[in-house]
Swiss-Prot record:
Known catalytic reactions: ATP + H2O + 4 H(+)(in) = ADP + phosphate + 5 H(+)(out)
GO biological process, one term: proton motive force-driven plasma membrane ATP synthesis
Database matches in NCBIfam families: ATP_syn_A_arch, PRK04192.1
Gene that produces this protein: atpA
GO cellular component, one term: plasma membrane
Topology of this chain in the membrane: Peripheral membrane protein
Function (record text): Component of the A-type ATP synthase that produces ATP from ADP in the presence of a proton gradient across the membrane. The A chain is the catalytic subunit.
Keywords, ordered alphabetically: ATP synthesis, ATP-binding, Cell membrane, Hydrogen ion transport, Ion transport, Membrane, Nucleotide-binding, Translocase, Transport
Enzyme class name: translocase
Protein name: A-type ATP synthase subunit A
Length: 585
C-alpha cells in the first residue's frame, strides 16, 4: 500500500505527491475520513485523483492511500432487486447503517457477505473447465436463476466442488487445478468496470427487442444487442419512455441507470416496479431489475463511474446467457460530469467546453453493447442492448453530445416538444426518427408475425410523409380544397397518428401491445385507406367515407384486450369493407 499527501484541492479533483508506484485508474482513499477516489493522471510521483464523494473539509497535508486495485464491481448472487449508487454501494444497506443521508467515507460491501444462498452444483470433480463455464446455479429470485461461472481468465480441472447446500458469496465452492497451481472459486467475482468482459464473437443483430410500444417496435425497432439514442428537450417524455421500455422490453434482465436525473424519477421506479407484474413470468418486475441511482444531488464525479458500473453488471448477466437491456438516463449528465472534470484538470476544451475525447468515451460505452456468443463450453447467444437518453439544452439536437451519440447509435428516437405539448405520447417524431436495423430484422417479423410486415410498414411511413406535405397546403387553403383522394390520405394518416402511434402508458391494456396486435392494428388501418380509396374511385361520397360508423371502433382498437382482439378485429375489417361499399351506392 502506497501512502502520499494532498497538495492541492479543486472541487472533486485532488492532487497528491508521494504516489510513485501507483497506476492509472487505481482506487485510493482520500483524507482522514477515507473518501473513495480514482487516479486519473500520473506525472512523476504526483497523482491526480477524481473523488467520488463531496470533498468539503478536506485540506492539504492529509493522506492519500492506494488500495492496490482498480475501480471494480462485485458480481454474484444478491445483485438483482438491489439499488446501488454510482460506485456500487448498496443504498438500502447504507440507510440501515446511517439513516436517510449517506455519510462520507462509508464503506459498505456491494454484496451481502453473510447471507447464505442455496448452491446447486452442476459440475463434477475431474471436469475440465475454462473461463465462463457454469459450475452451479443459485435461485436468486423467483424469475432468474443465477449461474455461477468460472472467472474468465481461469482454466484447468476441477479438483473439488462442494455438495448442494447453503453458502455465502465469499466461501470457496470449488478448487481448480491450473497451470499455476490450485485456485479457488467463490460465488462472487470482482471485475474492473472500465474493462469489457470477454466473449467468443459478436453476432448479427437480427432479432428485435420487442418493447410493446407500437412506435418503437413497428416503425423504429431496436435489435437485441443494438444501440439506441433518445434525445429530447425537458418534458418530452424521455423518462416515462425509458421506464416503459424497462417494464415491458422482452429482456431477461433490466439495468436502469439514473445518471444525474432527479431523485423523484428513481423513486417512481422503486415504488412502481415491485407492484408491476412481468408479463412473461407473472413475478414482480423488480425481481429482474438492477437500479443504479446517481441522482443530480449526488457528487458529479460518480456520474462518470455509474455508466461503467451499469454496463459491467449487464455484461455479467449476458455471460450467463441472458438478454439484458440497459437504460441510461441520461448520458448528457454523464458528459457534463466529464466536462466539469476536464475543466478542473485544465485540459484544452473542445466544442461547447466538452473535452476533446467526448466522442471516444461515448463510443467506448456504446460499443460494449452487442449480441454475442458467450465464452465457456455452453456457448449461449446473449445480448446487451443499450438505450441512452440524451437531454440537449433547449432541445438543440446540434449540440455535441447528441451529434456524437448519433454517429454511434443505430436507432434514433427523436422526442418532439411540439408533439408532447399536443399530448401525443410517446412523442417520437416519425419524420425525424430512424432505425438502421429494419433490414436485418425484417426476416424475423415476416416469419414470426406476418409476411407483409415490411410492406405495411413502408406504406404507413409513406402515408405519414404524404400527410406532412399535404399539411402545408391545408394550412394555406383548408382541407376542403384538396382533391378527394388526398382527403382520404389525410384521414388515414390521422388514424395512424392518433389510433396507432399514440399509446397510453397508464392504461392497463394499452401500456403493452404485442407484435401480432400491432401488426393487425396496422393492417386494419391501412385496409381502411385502400378500401376507401377504391370506393372513392367508384364514385363514393367523400363525406360519408371520412365519417363511417366503424371509425369509432377503429379508434378503440388499442383498448381491446389481447385475448378478445382477434375476433373483434376481424369484425371491424368486415364492417370497413361493408360500410365503404354502402358509401359508394
Amino acid at each position: 500500500m502506497i501512502t502520499g499527501n494532498i497538495i492541492k484541492i479543486a472541487g472533486p479533483v485532488i492532487i497528491g505527491d508521494g504516489m510513485r508506484g501507483t497506476q492509472i485508474h487505481e482506487m485510493v482513499r482520500v483524507g482522514d475520513i477515507g473518501l473513495i477516489g480514482e487516479i486519473i493522471e500520473l506525472e512523476g510521483d504526483t497523482a491526480t485523483v477524481q473523488v467520488y464523494e463531496e470533498t468539503a473539509g478536506i485540506k492539504p497535508g492529509e493522506k492519500i492511500e492506494s488500495t492496490g486495485g482498480p475501480l471494480s464491481v462485485e458480481l454474484g448472487p444478491g445483485i438483482l432487486k438491489s439499488i446501488y449508487d454510482g460506485i456500487q454501494r448498496p443504498l438500502d444497506e447504507i440507510k440501515s447503517v446511517s439513516g436517510d443521508f449517506i455519510p462520507r467515507g462509508i464503506d459498505v460491501p456491494a454484496l451481502d457477505k453473510v447471507k447464505e444462498w442455496e448452491f446447486k452444483p452442476t459440475a463434477s470433480v475431474g471436469d475440465k473447465v475454462n473461463g465462463g463455464d457454469i459450475i452451479g446455479t443459485v435461485d436468486e429470485t423467483s424469475a432468474i436463476v443465477h449461474k455461477i461461472m468460472i472467472p474468465p481468465k481461469m482454466s484447468g480441472t476441477i479438483k473439488s466442488i462442494v455438495s448442494q447446500g447453503k453458502y455465502n458469496v465469499t466461501e470457496d465452492i470449488a478448487e481448480v487445478e491450473t497451470e499455476n497451481g490450485i485456485e479457488t472459486v467463490q460465488m462472487m467475482q470482482v471485475w474492473p468496470v472500465r474493462v469489457g468482459r470477454p466473449y467468443t464473437n459478436k453476432l448479427d443483430p437480427d432479432v428485435p427487442l420487442i418493447t410493446g410500444q407500437r412506435a418503437q417496435d413497428t416503425f423504429f425497432c431496436v435489435a437485441k444487442g443494438g444501440t439506441s439514442a433518445m434525445p429530447g428537450p425537458f418534458g418530452s417524455g424521455k423518462t416515462v419512455t425509458q421506464q416503459q421500455l424497462a417494464k415491458w422490453a422482452d429482456a431477461d434482465i433490466v439495468v436502469y441507470i439514473g445518471c444525474g436525473e432527479r431523485g423523484n424519477e428513481m423513486t417512481e421506479v422503486l415504488t412502481e416496479f415491485p407492484e408491476l407484474e412481468d408479463p412473461k413470468t407473472g413475478n414482480p418486475l423488480m425481481d429482474r431489475t438492477v437500479l443504479i441511482a446517481n441522482t443530480s444531488n449526488m457528487p458529479v464525479a460518480a456520474r462518470e463511474a455509474c455508466v461503467y458500473t451499469g454496463i459491467t453488471i449487464a455484461e455479467y448477466f449476458r455471460d450467463m446467457g441472458y438478454d439484458v437491456a440497459l437504460m441510461a438516463d441520461s448520458t448528457s449528465r454523464w458528459a457534463e460530469a466529464m466536462r466539469e472534470l476536464s475543466g478542473r484538470l485544465e485540459e484544452m476544451p473542445g466544442e461547447e467546453g466538452y473535452p476533446a475525447y467526448l466522442a471516444s468515451r461515448l463510443a467506448q460505452f456504446y460499443e460494449r453493447a452487442g449480441r454475442v456468443t458467450t465464452i465457456g463450453s455452453h456457448k449461449a447467444e446473449a445480448s446487451v442492448t443499450v438505450v441512452g437518453a440524451v437531454s440537449p439544452p433547449g432541445g438543440d439536437l446540434s449540440e455535441p453530445v447528441t451529434q456524437n451519440t448519433l454517429r454511434i447509435a443505430k436507432v434514433f428516437w427523436a422526442l418532439d416538444a411540439s408533439l408532447a405539448d399536443r399530448r401525443h405520447f410517446p412523442s417520437i417524431n416519425w419524420l425525424n426518427s430512424y432505425s438502421l436495423y429494419v433490414d436485418s430484422i425484417t426476416n424475423w417479423w415476416n416469419s414470426q408475425i406476418g409476411s407483409d410486415w415490411r410492406d405495411l410498414r413502408n406504406t404507413a411511413m409513406a402515408l405519414l410523409q404524404k400527410e406532412s406535405e399535404l399539411n402545408e397546403i391545408v394550412q394555406l387553403v383548408g382541407p376542403d380544397a384538396l382533391p378527394q383522394k388526398d382527403r382520404v390520405t389525410l384521414e388515414s394518416a390521422r388514424m395512424l397518428r392518433e389510433d396507432f402511434l399514440q399509446q397510453n402508458a397508464f392504461d392497463d391494456t394499452d401500456t403493452y401491445c404485442s407484435p401480432s396486435k400491432q401488426y393487425n392494428m396496422l393492417k386494419t388501418i391501412l385496409l381502411y385507406n385502400t378500401t376507401a380509396q377504391s370506393a372513392l374511385a367508384d364514385g363514393a361520397d367523400i363525406n360519408k367515407l371520412v365519417n363511417l360508423d366503424v371509425r369509432v371502433d377503429l379508434g378503440k382498437m388499442k383498448y381491446i384486450p389481447e385475448d378478445e382482439f382477434e375476433a373483434k378485429v376481424e369484425d371491424i375489417r368486415n364492417r370497413i369493407t361493408k360500410e365503404c361499399n354502402e358509401a359508394g351506392q
